């Protein structure tokens, strides 16, 4: 059976505003065989009860910490020397990149047949039932495609 793996990331603010809705909707509507991993930063999981999702800290990833340190001045203001520009902010979406690549590396190390890896933004909602066959039926576009749920 093909394994389906979803990955997302969030911090405390994103979780309290939108992320908890995603987690609840996954628990309610998704087949349990769909694996969901959430990487977190600036978030204390001990303050929450989160079931059905594998939580992993981004700050345990050495490359992530090194990236943040090496690029701390590239925060969209070039260390407060210019007005904020989102396209100069090297940190803004880095958590997404590291969450997705870390999960991909983890799956590749576990098995040559790791299955699918699908990113889901934390501000998404799972409003309908989702099972493995629903996803596999979308494969008509080939091995790589964008999935909007």
Stretches found by the model and what they are:
Residues 1-84, 91, 105-113:
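N-terminal anchoring/stem segment of glycosyltransferases
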């Amino acid at each position: 059976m093909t394994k389906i793996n979803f990955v997302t990331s969030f911090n405390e603010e994103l979780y309290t505003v939108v992320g908890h809705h995603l987690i609840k909707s996954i628990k309610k509507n998704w087949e349990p065989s769909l694996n969901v991993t959430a990487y977190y930063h600036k978030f204390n999981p001990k303050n929450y009860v989160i079931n059905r999702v594998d939580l992993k800290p981004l700050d345990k990833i050495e490359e992530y910490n090194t990236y943040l340190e090496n690029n701390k001045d590239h925060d969209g203001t070039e260390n407060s020397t210019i007005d904020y520009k989102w396209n100069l902010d090297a940190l803004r979406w880095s958590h997404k990149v590291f969450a997705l690549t870390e999960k991909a590396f983890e799956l590749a190390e576990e098995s040559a047949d790791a299955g699918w890896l699908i990113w889901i933004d934390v501000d998404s909602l799972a409003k309908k039932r989702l099972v493995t066959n629903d996803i596999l039926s979308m494969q008509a576009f080939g091995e790589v495609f964008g999935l909007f749920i």
